Each structure stands twice: as structure tokens, then as C-alpha cells.
A protein has these predicted regions:
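Glycine-rich segments within core transmembrane alpha-helices of 12-TM secondary carriers
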Residues: 362-366, 370, 410
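Active-site alpha-helix of zinc metalloproteases
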Residues: 154, 314, 350, 358, ...
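Transmembrane alpha-helix boundary/hinge residues in polytopic small-molecule transporters
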Residues: 42, 319, 368, 372, ...
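Short, strongly hydrophobic transmembrane alpha-helices
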Residues: 18-46, 50, 316, 359-363, ...
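Alpha-helical transmembrane segments of integral membrane proteins
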Residues: 1-22, 289-293, 322-349, 353, ...
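N-terminal membrane-entry
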Residues: 293-309, 397-401
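Histidine-centered acyl-transfer/condensation active-site motif
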Residues: 310-320
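Nucleotide-cofactor and metal-assisted catalytic machinery
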Residues: 22-24, 34-290, 375-400, 467-638
Length: 638
């Protein structure tokens, strides 16, 4: 231990004598280690971190495999549950000691005269019990709160409690108002619990039974027009002792046919019922929570970690070269110490201690840099309409990763120069006057290897950068099919206000008239979804014979003047106008891709018509094509 302390003190003195070299070395390592630690922190938050709950390894996600068939309100290989189907599964399952469901939404919140949007977690009665989460203050929602009539209250997340109530215990028992309905505050969740969805966090947890109170009438997922077609609940459970995922999936498979028969949507036709009854239940681990971000972000994050690792290797090769050059100027000092009886092992240890000090300093600075970079990356991908939250504490995993990088970098850039300097022949060096000529061939060969390594790694990075630049250039220069500049987007959500359709139309017309009257505004229009906003809606286009789906088509509901506003080129036909009312024949404007896909590439699509899916008992939905426009991007820029 004394020898180690002496080596470290000696290393500090030598580094202090060369402040310029030390600063450059520490900065180089800080950038390399910081970039790697930042990416690792993101990977840890998205893929590796387990939920802060009791025994997360025994939790399992229950999801529906829809066999890649979709219609109406569900689509894709994995689907959430409707409320009636969730009730059936909850009552019939025997694989879990406890099972729970949850949904998420953004609702209007009023507290103390302030009104804004809150992230609301709709939790079934056993949600917190299944997770094993205990309250930080007060009590959490229980099965007694999630009953018909829903007389229970709400729980606040710790962060929301701190923001809105300053962390005061007097918040318990107070009332908050969601969508105009008062609810008492029951408790506060622990500081480490942000929910079960990676990338999101909730503000308020409320029983599932309160959903019809919040979203009244036809808008409710439980008591609205189509509760059996509203897929909004995610389900998870805690496996019984001795049960595994395979056994749980097998047991759920035995109850699914009966559960599906009890919940067939009455609007489905024979084809829809056939596919609905073919659904199966699957299970997968829930220790890391629910996440759509995990599948989307994992590959890019691993790629970024690999590229940042190359940057660190280049930095280590560069520092090794600097240390070799620095060691050549100290050959006489080292030769004298060897001649006086100093052991080579002690000298190598002292030289390695300098490298270790540089690596530790670089790791410490890199840790601070990593915290800034990781949070900056999250802020970069987050938008006001789709905020992203990741729990990224600087815990033992991140510190261990940074410490491991410090050890690795010490070996990579410090070991070879230390071994080379510790093995110089003192007699030959002293005879030449210590001018650094001894062992020059070996030193230069090592330096050439390091330089070649730097060049090779730099070429790999350069090639990767060029590919990224080309992809970015393609995205930047791609014609989106509409004007990107000079367009202002504002959102109005009538569903939250429970405004009748007639009043919505009147309000919208008056609003557009006022906007068009503003000096500098050329035109204005409305649409359900603005271009490239990350959301989309589709409907099934059917053939005219058997009514079988030809495929899904993206759709949007727009006002007259929309294509003029976004400057999407009209190829033929006309725009919508005031005569295209709800009582008039249904009309549509299609794009080039629609014509190719569903109309066999017709040269003139004007006057043609197509049919979309309609529930049994309703009139067939036929649309006459009155216009055709140029293709444009809608969901994203890909």
C-alpha cells in the first residue's frame, strides 16, 4: 500500500510538471469516456434497468397475438385489451397470484386555479399490489377503489407532488379536478416509481373504473359506443410460485376461446369474427417494463455505443503515442534511476500510475459530461406533444461502466509505453547522453503501429459518418410533397371539451375566418393530423365483390383549402367545397399511391369510387373520388 501511495504521489508530481500535456490527455479521455458512458446510460435506461418494484423477475406481460390481422380499432401483431376482454381474463386466469391492467391518457387537470394537461395512469385495483409498490405517503389505489360507482380517489406521483404541492403532507385529502370532476388525493407513490412504461412517466394514478367519469358518453372506452372495440388496456401479472412463462401461456390458452366468445364485438361481420376468435394470449417477461421505445431505439443505441467505442480507441492510441514521445525525453532520468538500483517493476508501476491518474481524471470529467450528454439526447428526441422521460440516475451500473473504461484505457494507452520505458538499457542510454536515440527502432515501430491503428479506426469512423451524412442529406433533400416553411400548426381538442358536433363545425368555421383575416396569413385549413406528427389513422378498403379487404389505407379528414395551405400539388379534379356536407354523397381526394394500389393505376381516377369497411347493419360506405394529389409523407419522413 505504501508503494502504491508513493507511486501515485510521484505520478501527481510528474503530471503537475506538464500541465499542458495533462490537460490535453484528460480532455481527450473525458470526451471518449463521456460519450461511451452517456450512450450506456441510455441503453441502461431503455433496455437493462428493471422496474423499481418487488421481485420484478416474477412479473409477466400478457398480450394478445392478433395473427397480424387488424380492422377498425386494432392493428398489428401485438394488441392491448378491451375492458370486457380484460374482465374475462381477470376472472378466468389461474396462472398469476395477482393480475392487473393499466391504460394511459392525457387529461385536463385543475388544481388551485391552474389548468393544464396531466399524464394520467388508469390503474386497476390490484395494480400497485401486483407490483409490490408501497406508498410514500397516504395509501395507494386498491381493489376496493376500483368498483362500480368508483367512489375512490387518486394517487400522485412523487415528482408531481413535489411540483404542485411542494412536497407537503397536507396534500393528502385535498381535491383535484380531472376533466371537470373532483377526486380526493389518497396518497403519493415512491420517488423511484415512475410507472411501468419505459419512456413515459405519470402524474396522477386513478382507478380504471373512473374512466367513464372522465370520458363520458360515446367517448368512454368502457361505457361508450364500442367498448368491445376499444383496445386500450395493457395487462401484466405476478406468476404463482413454481410457474414459468411457458406454463402460464399454456393455461391462458385454455381460457382464451371462452373469453373471446363472451366479448365478440357486435359490429363485426363474419370475417371479422373469424379473425377475432383466432386471437391467442402470449406472455413475456415484464421485469424491464412495457416499452415501444425499446424496439425502436435499441439498435441505434448499440450502434452509437460501438461508434463511441471506436472514438475511445482512437483517443487511447493517440495518448499512447504522446506517452511514448514523452517517455523518450525522460530516458536519461529513467536510465539513471535504473543504474542506481531502482527495480524495473517499480519504474513500470510509477509510469502506469501516471496513466491511471489520467484515466481516473478523465473518467470523473467524463461522468459529468455523460450526464449532460444523455439528458441532452433525451431532450433532443422529446417533443411537447410526445415528451420522453427516462430514469437515468448515476448509479453503480453507470459508475461501474465508467470505472471499467478507466481501467481499460489505462491498459490500452499506458501499458505499452510503460513496459517500453521500463526496459531500456541504462548503459546504452547514458553512453549516448540520453538523447533519446536508444531503442529508437523499437519505439518508432510501436509508434507506427499506433499511427496505423489510428488511421484505420478513423477511416471506419469516417465511412460511418459519411453514411450518416448521406442518409441525413437524403432526408433533408427529400421532397415531402408539401411546403415545410411558413406553416404554423395549432391543436384544438374538442373531445376534451365535450362540444357537440354542430358547435364544433361552427367554431371551426369562425376560427378559420378570423385566422384568414390576420395580416400576412395567405390561407388556413384544418385536418385531423398535421403532416409528419408521428400519428396516423387507417381504414380498410374493400373489394366490390365479397367485401374482403384489399388492404389498409392511411386517411385524414380535412377542410377545403388544406392542400392549398400546405402546397401539395393537385394533379387533377377539384378541392373539397361547401357543398361536400354530411348530408351530401361521400367524396374523397386520393393520392398517387392509392390509385396504384387500389385502382390499378388508372390514368383518370376522377369519378371512380371505392368502398371502406362498415359495421354490420350500417349502410355501405362508398366514396366518390373528386380529386387526385401528389404523394406526400404523412407519419414521418421515411
Amino acid at each position: 500500500m505504501n508503494t502504491l501511495l508513493q507511486n501515485l504521489r510521484y505520478g501527481l508530481r510528474m503530471l503537475a510538471k506538464s500541465p499542458g500535456f495533462s490537460a490535453v490527455a484528460i480532455l481527450t479521455l473525458a470526451l471518449g469516456i463521456g460519450a461511451n458512458a452517456a450512450i450506456f446510460q441510455l441503453i441502461d435506461a431503455v433496455r437493462l434497468r428493471t422496474l423499481p418494484v418487488n421481485d420484478p423477475s416474477t412479473l409477466a406481460i400478457v398480450h394478445i397475438d392478433t395473427k397480424n390481422w387488424g380492422s377498425g380499432n386494432f392493428n398489428g401483431p401485438y394488441s392491448e385489451f378491451t375492458f370486457p376482454l380484460w374482465q374475462q381474463v381477470e376472472q378466468r386466469q389461474q396462472a398469476f397470484s395477482s393480475i392487473a391492467a393499466w391504460g394511459a391518457d392525457r387529461d385536463n387537470l385543475a388544481t388551485g386555479g391552474e389548468v393544464d394537461m396531466a399524464h394520467v395512469l388508469y390503474a386497476s385495483g390490484d395494480f400497485f399490489r401486483t407490483l409490490g409498490v408501497s406508498p410514500f405517503l397516504g395509501r395507494l389505489i386498491s381493489a376496493a377503489d376500483d368498483q362500480n360507482g368508483c367512489a375512490g380517489g387518486v394517487d400522485l406521483s412523487y415528482s408531481f407532488w413535489q411540483r404542485r404541492y411542494g412536497g407537503t403532507a397536507s396534500a393528502i385529502g385535498k381535491t383535484i379536478t380531472l376533466e371537470g370532476h373532483p377526486f380526493p388525493i389518497l396518497g403519493v407513490t415512491p420517488p423511484s416509481f415512475y410507472g411501468v412504461s419505459v419512456g413515459d412517466r405519470f402524474d396522477i394514478a386513478i382507478p380504471v373504473c373512473a374512466e367513464p367519469i372522465i370520458h363520458q358518453g360515446q367517448f368512454s372506452f368502457i361505457t361508450g359506443d364500442r367498448p368491445r372495440e376499444s383496445w386500450w388496456l395493457s395487462v401484466f401479472g405476478r406468476l404463482k410460485p413454481g410457474w414459468n412463462l411457458q406454463r402460464a401461456t399454456a393455461q391462458l390458452g385454455t381460457i382464451m376461446p371462452a373469453a373471446l366468445h363472451e366479448t365478440i364485438p357486435p359490429q363485426y361481420d363474419a370475417e371479422g369474427v373469424k379473425h377475432y376468435l383466432a386471437f391467442t394470449l402470449e406472455t413475456r417477461p415484464a421485469a424491464n417494463g412495457f416499452s415501444s421505445m425499446r424496439d425502436d431505439a435499441s439498435d441505434p443505441l448499440w450502434l452509437l455505443l460501438g461508434l463511441s467505442g471506436l472514438v475511445l480507441l482512437i483517443a487511447c492510441a493517440n495518448l499512447a503515442n504522446l506517452l511514448l514521445a514523452r517517455a523518450s525525453s525522460r530516458e536519461r532520468e529513467i536510465a539513471v534511476r535504473l543504474a542506481l538500483g531502482a527495480s524495473r517493476g517499480r519504474l513500470i508501476g510509477q509510469l502506469l500510475s501516471e496513466s491511471a491518474l489520467l484515466a481516473v481524471a478523465g473518467a470523473v470529467c467524463g461522468g459529468f459530461l455523460a450526464a449532460v450528454l444523455s439528458h441532452s439526447l433525451v431532450a433532443f428526441i422529446s417533443t411537447p406533444g410526445n415528451p420522453v422521460f427516462l430514469d437515468m440516475p448515476t448509479d453503480w451500473r453507470v459508475l461501474g461502466f465508467a470505472g471499467g473504461l478507466a481501467i481499460l484505457t489505462t491498459i490500452l494507452f499506458g501499458l505499452a509505453p510503460a513496459l517500453r520505458s521500463g526496459n531500456i538499457p541504462p548503459g546504452a542510454v547514458l553512453k549516448t547522453g540520453g538523447r533519446g536515440s536508444t531503442g529508437g527502432h523499437e519505439r518508432f515501430r510501436l509508434q507506427r503501429i499506433l499511427v496505423a491503428s489510428q488511421v484505420a479506426l478513423s477511416l471506419v469512423l469516417l465511412a460511418s459518418a459519411l453514411l450518416f451524412v448521406r442518409s441525413l442529406r437524403n432526408l433533408m433533400t427529400r421532397d415531402p410533397g408539401f411546403q415545410e416553411n411558413g406553416i404554423l400548426v395549432a391543436n384544438v381538442d374538442f373531445t376534451r371539451l365535450k362540444v357537440p358536433d354542430a358547435q364544433q363545425e361552427l367554431f371551426t368555421r369562425n376560427l378559420l375566418d378570423r385566422i384568414r383575416a390576420i395580416p400576412g396569413v395567405a390561407t388556413a385549413a384544418t385536418s385531423n393530423r398535421s403532416p409528419v406528427n408521428g400519428s396516423s389513422s387507417n381504414d380498410w378498403v374493400l373489394d366490390d365483390k365479397g367485401g374482403h379487404p384489399n388492404g389498409a389505407s392511411w386517411e385524414d379528414y380535412i377542410s377545403p383549402g388544406y392542400f392549398e395551405t400546405i402546397e401539395n400539388a393537385k394533379l387533377m379534379g377539384r378541392d373539397f367545397n361547401s357543398t361536400d356536407s354530411a348530408n351530401a354523397p361521400k367524396v374523397a381526394i386520393v393520392n398517387q399511391t392509392f390509385v396504384k394500389k387500389f385502382l390499378n393505376g388508372a390514368k383518370d381516377s376522377i369519378g371512380m369510387r371505392f368502398r371502406v369497411w362498415a359495421p354490420p347493419g350500417q349502410q355501405p360506405r362508398y366514396y366518390n373520388i373528386v380529386g387526385e394529389v401528389k404523394d406526400s409523407v404523412y407519419n414521418d419522413m421515411h
